[in-house]
């Protein structure tokens, strides 16, 4: 009598079924990635003085700067606001991607994307 090599999986373990499920998850992830690439996320810094729009591919779509923060004598503050805003936008996109991928995969595949 053949011994069950995968006792934790039970006697009804079916590799073909597992492969079908993996393929289905992969297709769902690819579809979701396309959808996420089209989404746009907005982030602001300095109380809305700087606004960045970024898509799911982490491409900056636009940057808006309020004229009130443009001070030729203090370019450094404006630069800091832009950096903070871009970083916040990237963080938001990464969080969105992670949350959506977890819905599809149900576990930690997100490091792969």
UniProtKB/Swiss-Prot annotation:
Kindly give the InterPro entries that the UniProt entry links to this protein: YbaB-like_sf, YbaB/EbfC
Q: Where in the cell is it found?
A: Cytoplasm, Nucleoid
Q: Which Gene3D superfamilies does its entry note?
A: Nucleoid-associated protein YbaB-like domain
Q: Which GO terms of the molecular function aspect are on file?
A: DNA binding
Cellular-component GO terms for this entry? bacterial nucleoid; cytosol
Top-rank taxon: Bacteria
One Pfam family name is: YbaB_DNA_bd
Q: Provide the alphabetized UniProt keywords.
A: Cytoplasm, DNA-binding
Keyword Aminoacyl-tRNA synthetase assigned to the entry: answer is no
Indicate the quaternary assembly: Homodimer.
Give a short account of what the protein does: Binds to DNA and alters its conformation. May be involved in regulation of gene expression, nucleoid organization and DNA protection.
Q: Which NCBIfam families match?
A: DNA_YbaB_EbfC
Q: Which HAMAP family does the record match to this protein?
A: DNA_YbaB_EbfC
Report the family membership: Belongs to the YbaB/EbfC family.
**Name of the protein described by the UniProt record:** Nucleoid-associated protein Csac_1593
């Amino acid at each position: 009598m053949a011994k069950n090599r995968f006792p934790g999986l039970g006697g009804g373990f079916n590799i073909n079924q597992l492969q079908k499920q993996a393929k289905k998850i992969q297709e769902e992830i690819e579809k979701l990635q396309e959808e996420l690439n089209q989404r746009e996320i907005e982030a602001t810094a300095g109380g809305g003085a700087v606004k960045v729009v970024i898509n799911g591919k982490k491409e900056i779509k636009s940057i808006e700067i309020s004229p009130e923060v443009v001070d030729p004598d203090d370019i450094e503050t404006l630069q800091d606001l832009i950096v903070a805003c871009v970083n916040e936008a990237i963080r938001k996109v990464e969080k969105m991607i992670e949350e959506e991928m977890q819905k599809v995969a149900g576990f930690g595949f997100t490091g792969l994307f």
